[in-house]
A protein has these predicted regions:
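Structural signature of hydrophobic alpha-helical transmembrane segments
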Residues: 4-21, 71-80, 147-160
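A small-residue-rich subset of transmembrane alpha-helices
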Residues: 34-63, 139-171
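Selective transmembrane alpha-helices of multi-pass membrane proteins
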Residues: 68-90, 153, 178-207
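Membrane helix-loop-helix hairpins that form the core translocation module of multi-pass transporters
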Residues: 38-92, 97
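Small-residue-enriched transmembrane helix starts and helix-helix packing motifs
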Residues: 1-15, 91, 98-119
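Juxtamembrane transmembrane-helix termini in multi-pass membrane transport proteins
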Residues: 4-56
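Hydrophobic alpha-helical transmembrane segments in multi-pass integral membrane proteins
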Residues: 11, 53-58, 118-119, 123-134, ...
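Juxtamembrane helix-boundary/capping and inter-helix hinge elements in multi-pass membrane proteins
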Residues: 27-38, 105-110, 137-144, 176-179
């Protein structure tokens, strides 16, 4: 179980990629006071937590309702995560987690940026939702592993919030370039993990 928890933690942390949020948060809150940035950060993470728990609890039932097998979702989810990995490594916009220029312009004029673009698609976006569905699909509801995985989601979101609350100092130390380099390195790791999801799904479907 520990191996599965560590794998889930690594994949979810790489997918959420808290450091990549910081330049966006800094840009969208430029000219605003620290209280506004803190309020948006807390609200975005709270909304993201609700979305993550919703899919963790009801995701398996949704797959069953749609007649989608766990193996099929591993293949589809793995491909989605691989697309996200390509976006991270080559800094290309695959649409999995990025926003369009028009959406970015709209976000700049929003009074509340917590739901869009912070909570979705940056924190609880398609990649994070797919990762959660993959992790919880084969775990019995109410089991020790089920609650342990909820704890992993909590840890990732707390780390994300902690970084968002210190956006200014972190950006001064790491910078946009440092954040981009780290994102590319994590993208390579995510690509390998995504490929493993697809391999496991194909192997399970053929068994």
């Amino acid at each position: 179980m520990l191996d599965e928890l560590v794998k889930f933690f690594v994949v979810l942390l790489v997918v959420v990629e808290p450091l990549s949020l910081l330049p966006i948060l800094a840009g969208l809150t430029e000219g605003s006071n620290d209280a506004f940035r803190r309020r948006m950060s807390f609200k975005a993470v709270t909304i993201s937590a609700a979305v993550c728990v919703l899919f963790a609890v009801g995701g398996t039932a949704l797959l069953r309702l749609l007649g989608i097998s766990v193996d099929a979702f591993k293949i589809g989810g793995g491909i989605l995560l691989f697309m996200l990995a390509i976006e991270m490594v080559f800094a290309r916009e695959s649409g999995v987690r990025s926003i369009t220029p028009g959406e970015g312009e709209e976000a700049h004029h929003r009074v509340d940026i917590s739901v869009f673009p912070l909570a979705f698609p940056m924190i609880a976006g398609p990649g994070a939702i797919a990762t959660i569905l993959l992790a919880f699909a084969a775990v019995p509801f109410g089991s020790v592993q089920f609650f342990a995985q909820l704890g992993v989601i909590g840890v990732v979101l707390v780390l994300t919030l902690a970084l968002m609350l210190v956006t200014g100092p972190v950006m001064r130390v790491v910078g946009v370039t440092g954040s981009a380099v780290l994102g590319r390195l994590l993208g390579v790791l995510l690509a390998a993990l995504a490929a493993q999801f697809v391999i496991d799904g194909v192997r399970g479907a053929m068994a």
